[in-house]
Amino acid sequence: YAMTLSESANSIDKGMAAVVAAETNLSDVRGELGELIYCGYNINDLAENATFEEVVHLLHRGHLPNTEELDNLKAEFVANRNLPEGLIDVLKALPKDTSPMHALRTGVSALGCFDPEAETNDNLEAVRRKSIKLIAQVPVIVAAFHRLRQDKDILESDSNLGEASNFIWLITGNKPSEDMERTMDICYILHADHGFNASTF
């Protein structure tokens, strides 16, 4: 409920229409126009011309990366893909019929137990590092659980592949075609940010 003060009396408005929880410059969903904007860029332009890694940099830094910035970000993703062995044990302990979303939630929660910076939320660079780590590790968790529930070996990430390609590799055990890679990359871009979730405040 949102409480507003009118000239005559207090009133209680149902719903969230009058509630401002926070403001963001990261993305803007313009539903009436059918537009999604990331940091001033139309999602259609980004999906057509950018990579997922470039979009992550845009969302983290507010601008598209130059070559050096992009190379550094890619290296950071590759360096953070490995899962702690204890987390693999947690995934192996889950029943095979566990919902993949429940397995992912459990995996992400367990990651916090292995992260020495888990409680560091007052330092923007530490939060950014944790974000990069999660972006790199979430697909690995999903792929690992997918393969475990099919009695298949968990595959090692390929440092020569980008985030979208590596995910396909980890799931299938096959290097993706250019079309598969681009399709997954676009999916990643479209889901990179979608406004402010009511469930987060």
Question: Predicted segments — roles?
Answer:
Residues 2-201:
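Hydrophobic alpha-helical bundle cores within soluble ligand-binding/oligomerization subdomains
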